[in-house]
Amino acid sequence: MPLASQSAVSILCSLATMTSSMNSARIISRLGTGKVTAFSTLLTAAALLGFSFSGSFWFMCLMAIPLGLGAGCVDSALNNYVSIHYNATVMSFLHCFYGVGVMVSPYIMSVVINSAVGWRGGYRTASLIQALIGSILLLALPLWKKAHGEESIQAEKKMKVLPISQTLRIPGALMTCLLFLTFCAIEVICGGWSATYMVEAKHMSANLAARATMYFYLGMALGRFLSGVAAKKLTPWQIIFISMGILGVSQTTLLVSGNNVLTMAALLMTGLGVGPLYPNFNYMTPLHFGKDVSQSVMGMQMTFASIGTIAAPALCGVLGQLLGMGIFPAYLMIFYVLTAVGIIALRRTLRQVGRLQQ
């Protein structure tokens, strides 16, 4: 399939993800987090199975829609549920497994693709794994009520479902959404373009460049794991400040380093620094905006995160083609500065309305 066609499928999937995230509060208030999690997982399993039988570009576009719809709603649902019912440690560990999945899943897919079953078998394997998880979640639906009582089920049904404009008018909501755009942009830019930067600008071998990208994802998983451990002693804001400090050092190192080893270390540190931001900002959503509207805000946070993951790497590719991939460190630094400025602005707004958590 041509690269342009692949991009179209990815964009369709991302648009479906954003649509699902924006409507997550309405869906969850009707079905509940347990059913949304189970059905979304099964929906993605069906979409992956559809990909494996695809014989045309248009059918792949069609399958991208349920894949995105399932991914968007479950992300928003679980983030809000964990932030309300569990502590910051659980939230960080939850997202730590995302980093583990990002590292392990390409290896599993490559093994299957290189076997006799080919790429179709790879998608069927992924679909089977999702279907098994979805089936377990379906069987475990009664446990949701037992875990936190009937009160939590009723609270979900009574949550406020706000329109987009009203959600973004909540003091601090727009700024926290923009923060999700900027630091998620750092994640996907590093994951998508670091290897190209290492090869084209640093003249590194393709194998070594791929390893550097793996170091970034390793750092992200490790950062979220350490965030979960540190959450027992530190507040989310303290962890965010430490993470931003690490991220600042790593971005400066990327800008000035002429040494490949230092550059690879900087990518590891970038993952270590950016990793804790996503779970900790998610965890503070009900604390900053209230449990009654947190699902609406959470859905918009996931939407802006999706915008960042689509637009930022695409713009990086365009700039890299026009100016060369040497712009990679400076491009990342711009998003780091925007994140730092956004954090200052968010804290000022929350302090003014008396909702800032220490």
Which residues make up each language-model segment?
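Extracytoplasmic gate region of multi-pass secondary transporters
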Residues: 171-214, 218-221
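Cytoplasmic helix-loop-helix junction between adjacent transmembrane helices
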Residues: 63-97
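Helix-to-loop junctions at the C-terminal end of transmembrane segments
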Residues: 20-33, 223-235, 320-321
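Residue-level signature of mid-helix packing/kink "hotspots" within the transmembrane helices
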Residues: 13-22, 103, 217-225, 309-310
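Interfacial helix-cap and linker-helix signal at transmembrane-aqueous boundaries
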Residues: 27-28, 108-117, 198-199, 230-231, ...
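Symmetry-related core transmembrane helices of the 12-TM Major Facilitator Superfamily/SLC fold
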Residues: 121-142, 329-345
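Conserved MFS/SLC helix-loop-helix module at the cytosolic interface between two early adjacent transmembrane helices
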Residues: 19-58
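Helix-breaking motifs and short loop linkers at transmembrane-helix boundaries and internal kinks
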Residues: 32, 53-58, 203, 235, ...
